[in-house]
Amino acid sequence: MFLLYEYDIFWAFLIISSVIPILAFXISGILAPISKGPEKLSSYESGIEPMGDAWLQFRIRYYMFALVFVVFDVETVFLYPWAMSFDVLGVSVFIEALIFVLILIVGLVYAWRKGALEWS
């Protein structure tokens, strides 16, 4: 029989971790002074007054480069636990990891041919 009381700790953690940020935002919204003006609306960078337009538009190349970086960063996160327990796991897990890396290599070759890694 499925017992719901086994998950009481999970639900308590979920509720508490949801209430704390909501409560923090609500309290800061109530206690914060309301002051709008040109000083508050200007962008702040290292204590220096912004010169010219503060909003710069990044080229789409930057986003593609960042996306490829994130994909391979996540790959490292997935492969690290596998590498730490490599001697305990069997050959089937090695083959699965090999397939995972091969799929990522195919994705890298695709991004390379599309020019996502070209910065100029």
UniProtKB/Swiss-Prot annotation:
E.C. number, please?
7.1.1.-
Question: Where is this protein primarily located?
Answer: plastid
Which InterPro entries is this protein grouped with?
NAD(P)H_OxRDtase_bac/plastid (IPR023043), NADH_UbQ/plastoQ_OxRdtase_su3 (IPR000440), NDAH_ubi_oxred_su3_sf (IPR038430)
GO CC, one annotated term: chloroplast thylakoid membrane
Q: Which UniProt keywords apply?
A: Chloroplast, Membrane, NAD, NADP, Plastid, Plastoquinone, Quinone, Thylakoid, Translocase, Transmembrane, Transmembrane helix, Transport
Question: Has UniProt tagged this entry with the keyword Transmembrane?
Answer: yes
Q: Does the keyword Transmembrane apply?
A: yes
Q: Where are its TM segments located? A: 9-29, 64-84, 88-108
Q: How does it sit in the membrane?
A: Multi-pass membrane protein
Pfam families on file: Oxidored_q4 (PF00507)
Catalytic reactions of this protein? a plastoquinone + NADH + (n+1) H(+)(in) = a plastoquinol + NAD(+) + n H(+)(out); a plastoquinone + NADPH + (n+1) H(+)(in) = a plastoquinol + NADP(+) + n H(+)(out)
A molecular function GO annotation: NADH dehydrogenase (ubiquinone) activity
User: Where in the cell?
Assistant: Plastid, Chloroplast thylakoid membrane
- Which biological process annotations from GO are given for this protein? photosynthesis, light reaction
UniProt family annotation? Belongs to the complex I subunit 3 family.
Per its database record, what is this protein's job? NDH shuttles electrons from NAD(P)H:plastoquinone, via FMN and iron-sulfur (Fe-S) centers, to quinones in the photosynthetic chain and possibly in a chloroplast respiratory chain. The immediate electron acceptor for the enzyme in this species is believed to be plastoquinone. Couples the redox reaction to proton translocation, and thus conserves the redox energy in a proton gradient.
Q: Describe the protein's quaternary organization and the partners it interacts with.
A: NDH is composed of at least 16 different subunits, 5 of which are encoded in the nucleus.
The protein's name: NAD(P)H-quinone oxidoreductase subunit 3, chloroplastic
- Tell me what organism the protein belongs to: Eucalyptus globulus subsp. globulus (Tasmanian blue gum)
Q: What is the lineage of its organism?
A: Eukaryota, Viridiplantae, Streptophyta, Embryophyta, Tracheophyta
